[in-house]
């Protein structure tokens, strides 16, 4: 039986980029929570991460904003924002094209979904991943919901 982990976390750009301005106790508690979540994820020995995040106009725009979009790539680059502003270096995270194609094929049966073979990660994905898979080495399958 597959083992699945589900979790949620904040993606505010200042979590990394302005960490020095935070109350030390609050920052330490948040970073500890990210450490706990990373440990819980790694305890499942995951083959891939499925990330659901908001799209911050990095890949889609008002004249072409799908309700739902899924990434289907061999890799994803990020962050699209200034690395100094986020305090996250540029990275390339592996994707899982086969898993993405299988999920997209099933979802398309009931949901109007767009897929993208290129996707630049913005802070909404880059910030959590910088804590949860800091080497950016776990294959990612992304989905975007317009909320």
List each language-model region with its residue ranges:
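Generic structural hydrophobic/aromatic packing signal, biased to beta-strands
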Residues: 7-9, 103, 129, 140-143
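General beta-strand structural signal in soluble alpha/beta enzymes
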Residues: 7, 51, 115-117, 143
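Conserved ATP-utilizing enzyme core subdomain
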Residues: 109-140
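A short aromatic-anchored loop/beta-hairpin motif
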Residues: 1-106
